[in-house]
Amino acid sequence: MPKLTASEQTEFLSTPGILMRIACLRADGSPLITPIWFIHHENAIYFTPRAQSEWLGCLRQDSRIGLCIDEQDLPYRKVIIEGQAELIHDLGEDDLWRDLYRQIAGRYVPADAAEAYVQNTIDQERALWCVPLTGSTVKSWRMPLDGEPANGIWHQRYYAPGTHFSDS
């Protein structure tokens, strides 16, 4: 599958309504995967765990994280990010970043509903975390578009040697 160009990746990560799944580790080493809202801002992925969310505790104890952002329709764009989550604002500092919270909510619901959501949950503390793209492992791909080679549907490493689309 072709890798997304830098502009395709930025456009995709800015597309409203696409959920992100985060993967982090529980204290016992078992994985925890959660679908959440996010925003791509200043070359980083920002997200906001609630005070009572299990994954906030996981990130506090081990900030290694995997992020999966993908779409359900053609061309099935995907971005996988593996890196370290960084705490930007802790619980109780919500007023310092509330405008970004509105922007995050506004990616998923209309502006009036986003404002209502923020106001209705204003007394519920959240933390603000991010994963910078620089310094993280970022992989992206999509289905081949019209006019692109059909063998691009898979990466070359997946074709068995000597088969139709293999290089050997």
List the predicted regions and their residue ranges:
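Short beta-strand segments
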Residues: G17-A51, G57-L59, I65-E71, K78-I80
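Charged, gly/pro-rich active-site loop segments
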Residues: M1-L4, K78-S168
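Short amphipathic alpha-helical segments and helix-helix/interface helices
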Residues: Q9-T10, L56, Y101, Q119
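Alpha-helix boundary/capping residues
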Residues: P16, D62-S63, I104-R107
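Short, flexible segments with low predicted structural confidence
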Residues: Q9, S30-L32, P110
